Every structure is written in structure tokens, then in C-alpha cells.
A protein has these predicted regions:
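Catalytic glycan-binding domains that act on GlcNAc-containing polysaccharides
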Residues: 4-199
Length: 199
């Protein structure tokens, strides 16, 4: 691990520990890396929040399941996205080239958002656990985009603890990043913005 990567990964870890002890380091707790080449057609707050949860901004992150890089892309998913983008797929670049990883991951997020009609809850569930698992959950638990199904209750019914926690942590971060990036505290209809409908 190079010195730069150690610093980035370490700074978020230190910020989390510091916050637990009552001394929050806000700029390090929710970093907004200006060096990343963000796709203007994808919600920057969502991308940053996914990166924060997936890899803590460590570009060479590797999971036990084989997910790689900042946005923890599975190689097969990354390969398919690269094909759709008509760019060369290079597995090694997933952990060495931040902007390559973000480009593929952002496109995949955009694809999922379109597939699930803007619902961040369903998008994040699919991103973390896979569309196949989400399809089963929608069949078993109903669709949280529909009236009469509380999205917050739906999240709690997800059988995978990791995915339940993942959705909550990412949505929390999205709200904070929205505030940081806009420079003002928004008061949107959060249910509609994040869950895809009004309560």
C-alpha cells in the first residue's frame, strides 16, 4: 500500500474513532475528493456515499468475495459495464485507476437507478446484494415504492444484516453529502427523494 493510500484510508478511520470519542473531524469524516472525475449525470452525493461505505476511499480495496477498488465492483459486473460503455476492460485498473473504477461504478449505479425508477433503497439493495436477491425480496416482501408499504419497515425485513446496514449507512451519508456539496441544509421530502414515493 502506497503512502497516499495509507493516508486516505487512515484519515477516515481516525475521523470515525475521533467522532466516537466526542471530537468529530467533519472534513475527514465525509471527504469530498475533488480529484475524482465524476459523471455529471450521476448523483455525486450517492457516488461518494457508496465509495465511503464500500472502501473508505481506499482505491486498492479487495473484498473476500472478489469485489475491487473504490466502488467494490465485481469483475464480471465491471466487464459488462465496460462493454456497454465501449471501453477496454482492464481488471488491474479497478484497483489502480480511481477514475476508471468510478466511471464503471457510476454507470452501474445509474443503470440501477433507472431500472428501479429512481428508488435509492432498491438501487442500494441491488448494488450490495445483487439484483437476483432483490427480485426475491420484492416477491416475498412487496415493493416499497407502492403505497401501503413503508420503505423503512421494508428495509428492516431484508434478511441480510449487511444489506440492511448498508442501505441505512449510505442513505445517511447521502443526506450529509447533499448538505456539504450544496452548502445549505435542505428540507426536501426525504421519502420521495430517497425511497421513490411519499409516505
Amino acid at each position: 500500500m502506497c503512502i497516499r493510500d495509507r493516508f486516505i484510508k487512515g484519515s477516515l478511520t481516525v475521523a470515525k474513532k475521533s467522532t466516537e470519542k466526542g471530537t468529530p473531524l467533519h472534513s475527514e469524516l465525509f471527504p469530498t475528493n475533488k480529484d475524482f472525475a465524476f459523471d455529471q449525470n450521476v448523483d455525486k452525493s450517492l457516488v461518494l456515499s457508496v465509495i465511503r461505505q464500500e472502501s473508505e476511499f481506499f482505491r486498492a480495496a479487495k473484498s473476500r468475495t472478489g469485489a475491487l477498488g473504490l466502488m467494490q465492483l465485481m469483475p464480471n459486473t465491471a466487464k459488462e459495464v465496460a462493454r456497454k460503455l465501449k471501453i477496454k476492460y482492464q481488471k488491474s485498473k479497478l484497483i489502480t485507476d480511481e477514475n476508471y473504477n468510478i466511471r464503471l461504478g457510476s454507470y452501474y449505479l445509474k443503470y440501477l437507478l433507472k431500472r428501479y425508477e429512481g428508488s435509492k433503497v432498491l438501487t442500494l439493495a441491488a448494488y450490495n446484494a445483487g439484483p437476483a436477491n432483490l427480485k426475491k425480496w420484492l416477491s416475498n416482501m412487496g415493493d416499497p415504492r407502492k403505497k401501503g408499504i413503508d420503505p423503512l419497515v421494508w428495509i428492516e425485513l431484508i434478511p441480510y444484516p449487511e444489506t440492511r446496514n448498508y442501505i441505512k449507512r449510505v442513505l445517511e451519508a447521502v443526506w450529509i453529502y447533499d448538505t456539504k456539496i450544496s452548502g445549505s441544509i435542505e428540507k426536501p421530502n426525504l421519502a420521495k427523494k430517497y425511497f421513490g414515493h411519499r409516505f
